A protein has these predicted regions:
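His/acidic/aromatic-lined binding-pocket segments of jelly-roll/cupin-type domains
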Residues: 50, 56-61, 82, 89-90, ...
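Short beta-strand His + acidic residue motifs that chelate non-heme Fe in jelly-roll/DSBH
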Residues: 24, 49, 68-69, 92, ...
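A short, N-terminal "cap"/entry segment at the start of jelly-roll beta-barrel domains
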Residues: 1-34
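Glycine- and acidic-residue-biased ligand/ion/polar-headgroup-sensing regions
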Residues: 54-73
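Short acidic-glycine-tyrosine-enriched beta hairpin
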Residues: 73-94
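A generic "binding-loop/recognition-motif" signal
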Residues: 20, 54, 96-97, 105
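Conserved short histidine dyad/triad with adjacent acidic residue
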Residues: 37-55
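Double-stranded beta-helix
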Residues: 7-12, 99-138
C-alpha cells in the first residue's frame, strides 16, 4: 500500500494552483484512470476484502475517515493498516488484498481504477478473500 495526502504531500508531482477564482488541487498526475465512482459509507461499514489481478485502485477520501488494510496475495506478511482521512489517496496495486472499515459517519470517498471496474466490467477483475481486517477473527 502506498498513500499520500493531497494537502500535505508534494512528492507525487502534484500541484496546487490558486488565483482570484479559487483553488485547483491535483489529485493525480499522469495516471491512466479507466473508472471512477463515488462511495458513501455508514459507521462501521466494511468494504473490500478482495484484490484485483490487473487493476490498480486509488481511493481518495473526501470526508470522514476509515481504517485501510492491505496485504499481498499469497504472502505471510502481516496486514498493514492505515487511518485514512480527508485528502488521503491510497494506492492498491494488482495482487494486493485491500479492505476498509469506516470509523466516522458519512465517510465518502472516490474509488478510481486503472483497469476493468465499472459498467459491464464490474467485478470482472475482483477476487474475494476472507477478511484481512485486524481483529475480525478473534
Amino acid at each position: 500500500m502506498k498513500h499520500y495526502n493531497i494537502y500535505t504531500n508534494n512528492e507525487e508531482g502534484l500541484g496546487t494552483f490558486t488565483d482570484e477564482r479559487g483553488t485547483i488541487t491535483d489529485i493525480f498526475y499522469k495516471a491512466g484512470i479507466n473508472h471512477a465512482c463515488l462511495i458513501t459509507n455508514a459507521v462501521g461499514a466494511v468494504r473490500g476484502n478482495h484484490y484485483h489481478k490487473h487493476t490498480t485502485q486509488y481511493t481518495y477520501i473526501l470526508t470522514g475517515s476509515l481504517m485501510y488494510y492491505s496485504r499481498l496475495v499469497d504472502s505471510d506478511m502481516e496486514t498493514e493498516e492505515f487511518l485514512a482521512k480527508k485528502g488521503d489517496v491510497i494506492i492498491s496495486q494488482p495482487n494486493e488484498i485491500h479492505a476498509m472499515k469506516t470509523t466516522e459517519d458519512g465517510c465518502t470517498f472516490i474509488a478510481f481504477a486503472e483497469g476493468p471496474r465499472g459498467g459491464e466490467d464490474y467485478e470482472t477483475d475482483t477476487y474475494r478473500v476472507e477478511s484481512i481486517i485486524l481483529g475480525d477473527h478473534e
